[in-house]
Amino acid sequence: MCNHHPRHSHDNDTIRIRGARTHNLKNIDLDIPRHKLVVVTGLSGSGKSSLAFDTLYAEGQRRYVESLSAYARQFLQMMDKPDVDLIEGLSPAISIEQKSTSHNPRSTVGTVTEIHDYLRLLYARVGTPYCPEHNLSLSSQTVSQMVDAVLKLPEDTRVMILGPAVRERKGEFVDFFADLQAQGFARVRVDGEVYQLDEVPKLEKNIKHNIDVVIDRVKVKADIKQRLAESFETALRHGNERALAMEMDSGEEHWFSARFACPVCSYSLPELEPRLFSFNNPMGSCPTCDGLGNTNFFDPEKVVAHPELSLATGAIDGWDKRNQFYFQMIQSLAHHYKFDVNVAWETLPEKVKKVVLHGSGKEVIDFTYLSERGTTFNRSHAFEGIIPNLERRYRETDSETVREKLREYQNHRACPSCGGARLRKEARYVYVGGEPLHEVSAWPLTKTHRFFETLDLDGNKKQIAEKILKEITERLGFLINVGLDYLNLSRSAETLSGGEAQRIRLASQIGSGLTGVMYVLDEPSIGLHQRDNDRLLATLKRLRDLGNSVIVVEHDEDAIREADFVVDMGPGAGEHGGNVLIADTPENVAKCEKSVTGQYLGGKKSIAVPSERTPVNPGRMLVLKGARGNNLKNVTLELPLGLITCITGVSGSGKSTLINDTLAKITARELNRAQEEPAPYDDIRGLEHLDKVINVDQSPIGRTPRSNPATYTGLFTPIRELFAGVPLSRERGYNVGRFSFNVKGGRCEACQGDGVIKVEMHFLPDVYVPCEVCHGKRYNRETLEIQYKGKNISQVLDMTVEEAREFFDAVPTVSRKLQTLMDVGLGYIRLGQSATTLSGGEAQRVKLALELSKRDTGRTLYILDEPTTGLHFADIALLLEVIGRLKGKGNSIVIIEHNLDVIKTADWIVDLGPEGGDGGGKVIAKGSPEQVAKIKGSYTGKYLKVALNK
């Protein structure tokens, strides 16, 4: 059943690949059906990405870009030509990868999906502006509309028609009153009181007054239309295009304006434009925060880094005994306010703390300074305050280094002007359906979707908004269908996980409605709960049904079973991979003996449920109380120590907030003395059972090509020591530094140890070419002459972990670390492989290997965020073995995870939910997997029940 003979067809329904050798691909021939959902699976490092991204996508994209003019090409990224003999049947390609969308603080979910652009258009075309001061709508009315409004009042209501002539102006207005009398008017209303014109009291000329001319007094009846119309015309003439109808019995006022303005204060707006609602445009952004929604400020808690110390011993960095100039000021302050600089900061009176941090205001203080010559001199002036001093230095410095240092004492807070809305006042007071744009953007997507689906507009506004609303509701629907209903449009794109960012791009692609395209996706199910997986698969099928080829690199069992066609790569990783084991339907793959994927699908292999669970020790618990960051509802988290705990829950239920933003930061601050700011919580108990915390996340192990697994894990130092100890090295006087590619000496100076040289191409992307001097080996000729066991340092860096493990078998310091890299399934990566080429899952496993190789006390808390990212069934089995070893030493492991194979093997589960966003943030279930599987309201429990019974 395991044959995959390429069909020798030239039809239009097949993508034909012949002789693909990109990276570790072994000259493969493969036929993939077009317009189908194709899943590429296999072990980590087996060549899945090499096939899907570096061969199919790269060639599809390259051919499309090559068809454009040279001018257009300079704006597009050109892909390297893959090493392949032939590819036929390709369509233009779009890749949707796991990279987070943007590091730009101005990008939000709304801007990335372009929904915000449609919302701007909607608010500009059918929005109703209001006066920020009086909450009255800005709309111009004709005299007829004013008359109709009065006639709608109950019959016989007594109404006074007024012309608001003077608003908030100083003066006595004697001539004004005389002029009104000459025109035949009898009454005026001054500051709310009605007077006969000849009985108006003398007005105070330095106080602001409001004066209304009384035009008419009428009783509401059907036959007063003509009289009312004439009265309103007179009122508008005297009231600067404004008129006022006051009900005489209740005092209720009805304002009217013939101009597009507030009838009370004449506040007006020019015509509404879409850019007024853009926080990335000066016309729409809040002037205080420039549309970022938050401002930086010097946080007293960061400025006073060590409140348990005294001012003399370093409560505030830079203002203690070591800095004579600033400390003299503190001593003079202490003398003036009678406090002791040698007592702990936290015991000082509040008044003293306030003066030290914020200054003495206008109070003058005598300061005594010591000059460089040793003489003292006095100065009398107010004390600036430490925080104003930092603000001034931050403003005035030209040095980026100084700014960087000062930023350590800053924190973010919502902008005081716009409250985080990002928009200027005028835009915040325009309403559609009674709601302003910034409010609608802050709702969960489900609520926003419901609001626009049921939005009822009047008259021609309905017609104008029809097409815009269709686009908005469709796009919101696509986001909800890929399991992102808990997000909101104002959420910053920087805070999205890789999986969320990818699913947003996926939803945008469906929104674009393209057909005849080849989409290549990288594990779209990452970070997605089983419950939302069905919706994601339905979305992928919808892309396919539009007439596109959808190629997905995926390990999720449901995705593999639901695919039209499966390509299984293997059999091993790295050098041992790169072959197509089987390319067929999921049913046939499940019957294939030699395919590891097939063995798991067919049930021949599986990850076993432990026969017994490690019991919880009630005396060793970590208890976090009152966690309420983001959507958490005052959560109490109980973690049994010495066990493996899984934190589960649907996407957006609060797992990352609880673990990464709260628990990890508290423990890092308390145990590792890190400068962390956890999300709000009340209390934590049980830290005495731990001595350190290690957060093994998916951030890159280095951001430059110089970082690599060997340097990160500390392997490279003992390897360089071995080379420095070779007789020829000692003879030449070479030390360890000679074998570093980061410092002068042994490295090739032509490329400064990079191995490649960047060539700037104006019409094409920058090209990296191997260095002509060292031919990509990074070192100079003399250094490469030094050999250890017949290999030079460059050849060692080019070895895979597996090859190096054998090569350094007799060197325990090196082989132990290499063995741990193999244990986490990374035998295929090269020691000198650039960190920038490692996936998030690989980077996480390199970190895990580093921790495994350290000798530990058995009192460490390990935090892992979705460690199964990018892992095949067989890799997960390896990972669980490694985590089991950490537990075996007495350590505690907390894993945020959706993968049921990991969840079912945990000792303890804490399930958050029930839903995502506002509907989540509570602990729904806790206990062993068997206990959680019985809990009715838990989505995780429902799927876990099935997994435990397999």
Swiss-Prot record:
Highest taxon above the source species: Bacteria
Residue intervals of the ABC transporter domain: 319-596, 616-945
Gene Ontology cellular-component terms listed: cytoplasm; excinuclease repair complex
GO molecular function: ATP binding; ATP hydrolysis activity; DNA binding; excinuclease ABC activity; zinc ion binding
InterPro entries in the cross-refs: ABC_transporter-like_ATP-bd (IPR003439), ABC_transporter-like_CS (IPR017871), ATP_grasp_subdomain_1 (IPR013815), P-loop_NTPase (IPR027417), UvrA (IPR004602), UvrA_DNA-bd (IPR041552), UvrA_inter (IPR041102)
Main location: cytoplasm
Keyword Nucleotide-binding in annotation: yes
SUPFAM superfamilies reported for this sequence: P-loop containing nucleoside triphosphate hydrolases (SSF52540)
Pfam family, one: UvrA_inter
Annotated positions binding ATP: 42-49, 649-656
Keyword set, alphabetical order: ATP-binding, Cytoplasm, DNA damage, DNA excision, DNA repair, DNA-binding, Excision nuclease, Metal-binding, Nucleotide-binding, Repeat, SOS response, Zinc, Zinc-finger
Zinc finger region(s), C4-type: 262-289, 748-774
Compartments where found: Cytoplasm
Gene Ontology BP terms: nucleotide-excision repair; SOS response
Family stated for the protein in its record: Belongs to the ABC transporter superfamily. UvrA family.
Record's subunit section: Forms a heterotetramer with UvrB during the search for lesions.
HAMAP family tied to this protein: UvrA (MF_00205)
Role summary: The UvrABC repair system catalyzes the recognition and processing of DNA lesions. UvrA is an ATPase and a DNA-binding protein. A damage recognition complex composed of 2 UvrA and 2 UvrB subunits scans DNA for abnormalities. When the presence of a lesion has been verified by UvrB, the UvrA molecules dissociate.
Name of this chain's protein: UvrABC system protein A
Organism, as annotated: Neisseria gonorrhoeae
